[in-house]
Amino acid sequence: MTPSPLDRLLAALDELDADAAAALFASDGRLLTVDGRRAEGVEAIRTLLGDFLGQLRSTTHVTTAHWHDDDVSIAEVEASYELRDWLKLTDLRRVFLLRDGPGGYAELRVYGAHERPLASHQSAADVMPIGARWLPPL
């Protein structure tokens, strides 16, 4: 079975490979992360993904539901992260909206909740809680 466009992206993210993930985007592709950061163009996307992945020791993304219509993929994803400082964040729910195009991914939007970047946490008292958890952007 051929992996879906979203499967290819999640595999690159789980390998912590910003170059491979960015290479999937069209030259004028766009990215919106859960915490509101945006990138337009493959180099800006590579930089944003590199900053994000550089904060991690590991990450896993598990697709729990997936819909596909023409060039659009929508997926519910559970993400888990281990940060460089050993903090583990598990089973964080995300929605990925991916628009594919002839030159690569035209747009990726990741939804969950607006929050601060990963590196901005200081202690459990300083993080922005969403319910009882703090959520990273991808």
Segments and roles (model prediction):
Residues 34-47, 68-70:
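Short beta-edge strand/loop motif at the mouth of beta-sheet-based domains
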Residues 1, 47-138:
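A beta-strand edge to alpha-helix "cap/lid" segment located at domain peripheries
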Residues 1-17:
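Short, aromatic-enriched amphipathic alpha-helices that serve as compact interaction elements
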Residues 30-40, 52-55:
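A short gly/proline-enriched turn/hairpin at secondary-structure junctions
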Residues 27, 34, 101:
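Short, ordered coil/turn segments that flank beta-strands lining enzyme active or ligand-binding pockets
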Residues 16-28:
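Short, well-ordered alpha-helical segments enriched in acidic and aromatic residues
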Residues 12, 24, 52-55:
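Short alpha-helical functional segments enriched in proximate histidine and acidic residues
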Residues 8, 20, 44-47:
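Alpha-helical elements of Rossmann-like donor-binding domains used by nucleotide-donor carbohydrate transfer enzymes
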